Design a protein with these regions (language model features):
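Bacterial Sec-dependent N-terminal signal peptides
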Residues: 1-27
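Amphipathic, charged-and-aliphatic alpha-helical interface segments
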Residues: 38-49, 178-191
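Short conserved catalytic/interaction loops centered on acidic-Pro-aromatic/His motifs
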Residues: 192-199
Length: 202
């Protein structure tokens, strides 16, 4: 497990420019991630792999690094878009068990802030296109191509659900969501085109 995390950290350190570009924060040194960012990487990757034993250890580390309950929950929810509901739900169940165990030991973890209400006006598809444009810094007015033409429903789901329903939730910044995304894609393997696309966002 430790080798998996170390190799992921080596890849993901390249994505830290996301924090400069997407959240306006100063870019950290490229050889370091802070404790919370490392926890986000590990939690997302281990959830995607289904390594629940390792995940519980990293969930504890994340809480000890002052990641809030809400932020960790949101990381786990976000993973389902890339590794599916079963892995995400098992991660959430593992987190529930960790919180119960910590509570039984008298540990009080910070709840944090829940998501603000998401916008309800306008077309969800257009809202998703707008967010994707913000992330990629490229207009999203090109005609559909490749897999989006072959299976247009997937384009609709990506725009309306992933980039509207999920990315509009403000518990995590865009940069934090990209850390989760790249961690999951790195962990599941055979997703190099998607991984390249998300690195390009950074």
């Amino acid at each position: 497990m430790q080798n998996t995390i170390q190799s992921l950290l080596a890849v993901l350190v390249l994505a830290m420019s996301c924090f400069e570009r997407l959240s306006g924060q100063s870019q950290p040194p490229l050889d370091t991630l802070d404790a919370q960012q490392k926890s986000i990487v590990s939690i997302a990757a281990l959830t995607a792999k289904g390594d629940l034993t390792g995940l519980k250890k990293e969930l504890n580390k994340g809480l000890d690094a002052d990641l809030t309950i809400m932020k960790i929950k949101e990381c786990l929810v976000h993973t389902y878009a890339y590794c599916g509901f079963p892995r995400s739900i098992r991660g959430i169940q593992s987190f529930m068990a960790v919180l119960e165990e910590r509570k039984s030991k008298g540990i009080q973890d910070a709840m944090g802030v829940d998501a603000s209400p998401v916008p309800q006006g306008g077309s969800k598809y257009e809202r998703g296109k707008k967010i994707l444009g913000e992330l990629t810094k490229a207009p999203q007015d090109q005609p559909l191509a490749a897999y989006s033409v072959f299976a247009p429903a997937i384009d609709t789901f990506l725009k309306e659900h992933l980039f509207a329903d999920i990315f509009e939730r403000d518990v995590l910044s865009y940069a934090e969501r990209e850390l989760v995304t790249i961690s999951v894609l790195s962990a599941i393997g055979n997703a190099e085109p998607m991984l390249r696309s998300h690195f390009a966002i950074c």
